Amino acid sequence: MDRLNGTPRLMIVSDLDSTMVDHDDPQNLSLLRFNALWEAYYRPDSLLVFSTGRSPDSYQLLRAEKPLLTPDITVMSVGTEIAYGESMVPDVGWEQLLNQRWDRGVVVEETSKFPDLLPQSEIDQRPHKVSFYVEKVKALKIIDVLSERLEKRGLDVKIIYSSGIALDVLPKGAGKGQALAYLLKKFAFDGTLPANTLVCGDSGNDAELLSIPQVYGVMVSNAQEELLEWYSENMRNNSNIIHATERCAAGIIQGIGSFCLGPNVSPRDIGDFQKCKVDIISPGYEVVKFYLFYERWRCADIPKSTHHMQNLKSVFHSYCTLVHPSGTEQHIYQCVDEMEKLHGDWQGRQFQVWVDRVSSAQIGSDLWLVKCAKWESHGEEKYCCLTTILMSSKAELPNDFIWLHVHQTWLDGCGVKQPDTWSASKYINLNTFNSIFAATAADSLNENVAATFFISVLSSGAVLQNKLEPISLWQIDIPF
């Protein structure tokens, strides 16, 4: 959360399974649409919160399976655990609040007396969450009796039934809604309350999110009967809650548009960027657009044309070079030439590219340092490069950006593990310094600005080397 300098423009709080993630969409099309929209327009000044019933381990399994963005805050285990940032730092204060009138041992003891309660897997059992499966016809009676018994034992608990099968026993002060209320209270105390908050869900355990005052809410089109019944009984007259006509992440995008919370046309919905004018152009938008073009080129979703390649080269400065994660350094025009030969090499097969954690900082009058995690998915395989880009805005067209240099390193554990040419040597050729200094000098930029770029790259673990051995990009097969 510290990455934002002021009040968040928008905070999206979304459930994962069957809300952000559509398990009936093997190509993850709606999720990738949301990803592109968020990274292009919202990441710099907004907050993304995932609120899930999954435990931390189960959440990580989903991240390994699906192209999920990195959220600013993760609320897990039905609102009993809150973690911040990429490193998922736990909120100890929240844990201490939940300890009041809670004894997990007593809960386990009392629930063991109900043979119809089938314990969920060990991965889903947490310090403040005891979870079971139970048939819907038996659930209501069990909830009434169990609540009474636990109250007699001196506990103050909440029992949530969702998805027509899952029963969770939590501390009274827990739950997705209470976790969100706690976060909003913290933001208000710090003077950083988001200008708008949009909550999104599909099942019974998301009802609490929609109950929070002064938030907008979206029930995705595939919302379960239990949530729709709750809405009909409690929130039908609340104009700040809609039942979307689109499934999952597409329904979230629909909610953004319905409540006029900001841009709601994903870059993935734009067929021809040259013919489409957008109101917000930023370094982050340029990165999203570039890698979307790269995906479409490899999949032959756009026709092969020298015109496309000429336009692509116009994005790069004549001095621009790319350092591949293998350590290979190439002039960017060579990379474009190699890319031209790869047109349609993934046609008819699943090949997807998306970016995560896009950030940009202005380090000169017209110079930006852009960082992102660039992911590629080839069927069951996923690779990720941490990418650092130096960009300059065109003086005559300040909303257009020129790429001066690109440096990539493998994200630990997410590189290619097969040929030796893929080894993540993380080198910077000293000649690269000369190229960037020449480019910055030609553009009347301070050498300190170029130095800032290299300090940033070196901080990611790159190593200076006098000479890099050339490796054919045909061996590497990924020019960008």
Language-model-detected regions and their locations in the chain:
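Short, aromatic/basic amphipathic alpha-helical patches
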Residues: L62-E65, D144-S147, L227-M235
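Mg2+-dependent phosphoryl-transfer enzymes with acidic/Ser/Thr/Gly-rich catalytic loops
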Residues: D2-M11, L170, G177-D279
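A beta-strand edge to alpha-helix "cap/lid" segment located at domain peripheries
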Residues: C276-C299, T306, T321-T440, F453, ...
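Residue-level recognition of beta-strand termini and adjacent short loop/turns
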Residues: S163, N234-R236, G364
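Conserved acidic, metal-coordinating active-site core of Asp-based
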Residues: V107-P213
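Asp-based phosphoryl-transfer active-site loop
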Residues: P8-D25
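Active-site phosphate-binding/coordination module
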Residues: L29-D124, N222
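Short helix-terminating capping/connector loops at secondary-structure junctions
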Residues: N5-T7, Y42-D45, L68-L69, I123-D124, ...
